[in-house]
Amino acid sequence: MIDNSHLTEHGIKYLTMISKQFVLITSNLKHPAFRVKADNMHIIYQDKLNLRNALTQLKCQYGCERITIQTGGTLNAMFLREKLLDYVDVVIAPVLIGGKETSTLIDGESLTTMDDLKKLGVLQLESCETLKHSYIRLRYKVIR
């Protein structure tokens, strides 16, 4: 899990209770996880978040071969722009939400040049599935 400020000490304890192994990646030296003692908790501290390095550590130190990312637009953008995604799985809800301050699927800095566009992966639709209550699931392969 990547977190700097959202998890509480209670939340960390809960996650360690329900997890076989729990790995936290943070750049916050005052993160509440540092106060929790749990044999199955591991903390990867980075001065500044480096996703590629964090993924390498997860693989080399903990044997992690595959991860699922369920995050907000800022981290989504970081993973996409660093070309760290193989697949994108999106579930669309039957509601329209918006506004100037509303987070989107991909947040972060605006793309303003052709070089910025090259940082993105092109998506190839692999499947489209209608779910209950008018939800739609789209699965894409990221083409590099």
What function would you assign to each model-found segment?
Residues 1-144:
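Enzymes that bind and transform nitrogen-containing heteroaromatic metabolites
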